[in-house]
């Protein structure tokens, strides 16, 4: 079923390149990543407010299969360089996801905040973790996606264009990842 949906989405993107607006072309992306930029799909990142240069790099990597996740590789395959820039610029203008309404567990928030400070996440991701240029916005990202991604950096199974996250995650204990993701997902 997922392959069928992906194939239909790819066909829609490829055939509509010249006749549809960017809003129409991005609709298949937002079906998984959230219509308003806030994903409701498990382990799927929210794209709202993401840095355009970061998104451009990720889309390029998916298109060229330098980053592998088959649905995304297929979706990005027909996109031209201009398409990648257009999609990235559009995504950057979608409002970033809001923090969850509940205040959260104070002890977990405190542990997560201490990890953010100790490992200086703000150095690359900005004090509000909004990201900059080719560094992603991680504030208010889906907690499950953050935990999965951080664990992949820690075990070196996620490779990007930059090895710095593997180095950052090396000293962080596996059991601390949940608190780190919990805090970052609830940034206020």
What residue ranges belong to the model's regions?
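Hydrophobic h-region of N-terminal signal peptides that target proteins for export
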Residues: 5, 10-18
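Sequence/structural segment immediately N-terminal to covalent heme-attachment motifs in c-type
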Residues: 18-38, 99-100, 104-127, 142
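Protein kinase-like catalytic domain
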Residues: 33, 63, 125, 154, ...
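Gly/Gly-Pro-rich "capping" loops immediately C-terminal to redox-active cysteine motifs
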Residues: 37-67, 73-79, 113, 117, ...
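C-terminal capping alpha-helices of c-type cytochrome domains
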Residues: 77-99, 144, 168-188
């Amino acid at each position: 079923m997922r392959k069928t949906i992906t194939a239909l989405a790819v066909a829609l993107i490829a055939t509509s390149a010249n006749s549809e607006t960017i809003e129409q072309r991005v609709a298949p992306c937002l079906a998984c990543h959230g219509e308003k930029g806030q994903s409701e799909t498990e382990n799927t990142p929210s794209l709202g407010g993401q840095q355009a240069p970061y998104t451009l790099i990720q889309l390029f990597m998916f298109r060229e299969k330098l980053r592998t996740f088959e649905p995304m590789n297929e979706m990005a395959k027909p996109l031209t360089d201009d398409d990648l820039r257009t999609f990235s610029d559009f995504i950057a203008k979608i409002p970033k996801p809001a923090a969850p309404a509940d205040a959260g567990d104070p002890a977990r928030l405190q542990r997560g905040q201490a990890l953010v400070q100790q490992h200086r996440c703000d150095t690359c991701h900005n004090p509000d973790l909004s990201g900059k240029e080719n560094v992603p916005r991680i504030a208010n990202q889906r907690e499950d996606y953050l935990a999965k991604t951080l664990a992949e950096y820690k075990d070196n199974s996620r490779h990007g264009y930059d090895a710095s996250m593997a180095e950052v995650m090396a000293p962080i204990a596996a059991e601390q990842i949940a608190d780190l993701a919990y805090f970052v997902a609830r940034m206020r």
